Curated annotation (Swiss-Prot):
The Cys-rich domain is responsible for the localization of the protein to the membrane ruffles. Signal peptide: none annotated. Belongs to the sprouty family. Keywords: Acetylation, Cytoplasm, Developmental protein, Membrane. One of its GO terms (cellular component) is membrane. Inhibits fibroblast growth factor (FGF)-induced retinal lens fiber differentiation, probably by inhibiting FGF-mediated phosphorylation of ERK1/2. Inhibits TGFB-induced epithelial-to-mesenchymal transition in lens epithelial cells. GO terms for biological process: animal organ development; negative regulation of epithelial to mesenchymal transition; negative regulation of ERK1 and ERK2 cascade; negative regulation of fibroblast growth factor receptor signaling pathway; negative regulation of lens fiber cell differentiation; negative regulation of Ras protein signal transduction; negative regulation of transforming growth factor beta receptor signaling pathway. This is Protein sprouty homolog 1. The keyword Cytoplasm applies. The keyword Transport does not apply. Residues 54-157 are annotated as: Disordered. Residues 183-295 form the SPR domain. It is a peripheral membrane protein.
């Protein structure tokens, strides 16, 4: 019984071991076959198609909501990019063909489809770029023409405006000067009868007043006398003393003149102040006589209103 049991057990072992080996081999084969089924061409096509679909229209949709000047910038970039893309697509088929010979036959049509879609996209971009180049090529010569016209208009306009302003000012002057003197025939308004002062200007970055009065004061050192009287006098009377140190109508006239006489020993230029002041008054009178357009009569109280409708009417006495 022992040898039979041994043979039986041996035969049963053989029967049990062979299926085990077959199952392992089948599992190995199934594992090898399953990755091929997972990495199918349909799945690869779906991934490629989704990527190409997202990359293609997104470039076209971006410049749509933007403003006009920004679209011009993108148009210029599209003009440069398709040339490089075409060159890449022209060189890519050779590289893909080389890889296709080495790789499996299943990947060949996938690469050919991608290149075909890329060439279609490049052809569409080329057509859009060529149309944009035509538009851009025509636009530059039209832009400088209105620019030159505007510059010419700006150069010619100020002359016309100046003439209009002068005419308007003359009309306003004619309407303002209505009251005229009966004796001299000149206007008696406040602007025309006001005395004219000597011209002055600001120097040293508009910090110093340059006028005839200031030249006389600084030339004769009278500014030092005004400064001393301002600091030595009281607060209530300092303004009057410093402004008019040579006035005879104010109080303490003798003390002020004695002080200026003592200062003239050290500053002899103070002696030139009285004649310089007289020359200044004479210059003021001459300038006022020449440039004052209004009436100078003192006792002419009779005036009449100028009639705009009758400008050539003679002067008549008021009723």
């Amino acid at each position: 019984m022992d040898p039979q049991n041994q043979h039986g057990s041996g035969s049963s072992l053989v029967v049990i071991q062979q299926p085990a080996l077959d199952n392992r081999q089948r599992l190995d084969y199934e594992r090898e076959i399953q990755p091929a089924a997972i990495l199918s061409l349909d799945q690869i096509k779906a991934i490629r198609g989704s990527n190409e679909y997202t990359e293609g229209p997104s470039v076209v949709k971006r410049p749509a909501p933007r403003t006009a000047p920004r679209q011009e910038k993108h148009e210029r970039t599209h003009e440069i990019i398709p040339i490089n893309v075409n060159n890449n697509y022209e060189h890519r088929p050779t590289s893909h063909l080389g890889h296709a010979g080495l790789s499996n036959n299943t990947r060949g049509p996938i690469l050919s489809r991608s290149t075909s879609t890329g060439s279609a996209a490049s052809s569409g971009s080329n057509s859009s770029a060529s149309s944009e180049q035509g538009l851009l090529g025509r636009s530059p010569p039209t832009r400088p023409i209105p620019g030159h016209r505007s510059e010419r208009a700006i150069r010619t306009q100020p002359k016309q405006l100046i003439v209009d302003d002068l005419k308007g000012s003359l009309k306003e002057d004619l309407t303002q000067h209505k009251f005229i003197c009966e004796q001299c025939g000149k206007c008696k308004c406040g602007e025309c009868t006001a005395p004219r002062t000597l011209p002055s200007c600001l120097a040293c970055n508009r910090q110093c007043l340059c006028s005839a009065e200031s030249m006389v004061e600084y030339g004769t050192c009278m500014c030092l006398v005004k400064g001393i009287f301002y600091h030595c006098s009281n607060d209530d009377e300092g303004d009057s003393y410093s402004d008019n140190p040579c006035s005879c109508s104010q109080s303490q006239c003798c003390s002020r003149y004695l002080c200026m006489g003592a200062m003239s020993l050290f500053l002899p230029c103070l002696l030139c102040y009285p004649p310089a002041k007289g020359c200044l008054k004479l210059c003021r009178g001459c300038y006022d006589w020449i440039h004052r357009p209004g009436c100078r009569c003192k006792n002419s109280n009779t005036v009449y209103c100028k009639l705009e409708s009758c400008p050539s009417r003679g002067l008549g006495k008021p009723s």
